[in-house]
C-alpha cells in the first residue's frame, strides 16, 4: 500500500481514508492534497476540525467500498475540548453535526453498531481482507503524549499489526504495544473505541 502523509494537523483521518480509497481505486483517488482536503471538507465535524467517523464511512461508500461502522458510543464527545480552546456550545454544535452525518449514513444503508469491540475482532476483519480505520491513542505508537487519532490498519502478520499512520508512515506494531494504544484511548484520553470496516 502506498503511503500518503497528511499535510495538515487536522487531516489525519482524511489522509488515512485516502490511502484506503487509493488502494481500491487509484485512478479515482490519487494521493494528493486536493483529494485529502476533499475528504476533510466533506467529513469535518463542524465547528470542530476533526472528521466524523460517519462522514468518513459515507465517503468510502460513495467511492464504492463496503463500509460498516462500530462505535463504543454513538454520540460525539470531546472530553478535553477546553485544551483545544473550544467552548461547550461548539461541542454541542459538533454533536448535532455528528447526528446529521449518522442519520445520512443510516439512510445510505451503512450498518452502524453501538457496542464495545476488541482487537481480536479487528484481527478477524483483517483476516477477511478488510482494511480498518481505527481510533487509537497514537501517542503510544509515536512515543509522544497521549493523542486520539485514526490510523489505517491493513494487516496482522506474525504477531504484528501493519498500520499506515498518516503522520509516520507504514509501521509494524507488536501486539502488546497495539493493545496499549487501544486501551489507553479510554483510560488516558477518555474517548470511545471506533472503527470503520472497509472492503
Describe every region a protein language model picked out.
Residues 54-57, 119-123, 180-186:
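Intrinsically disordered, low-complexity boundary segments flanking structured domains
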Residues 44, 126-127, 137-199:
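Noncatalytic regulatory segments and standalone regulatory/sensor domains
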Residues 1-70, 124-128:
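Active-site nucleophile-adjacent alpha helix/oxyanion-hole segment immediately C-terminal to the catalytic cysteine
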Residues 84, 89-161:
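Active-site-adjacent substructure of cysteine-protease-like catalytic cores
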Residues 61-100:
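A basic- and aromatic-enriched beta-loop-alpha substructure that forms the phosphate/nucleotide-
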Residues 37, 67-68, 132, 151, ...:
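A broad, low-specificity signal marking well-ordered, structured residues that form hydrophobic/aromatic
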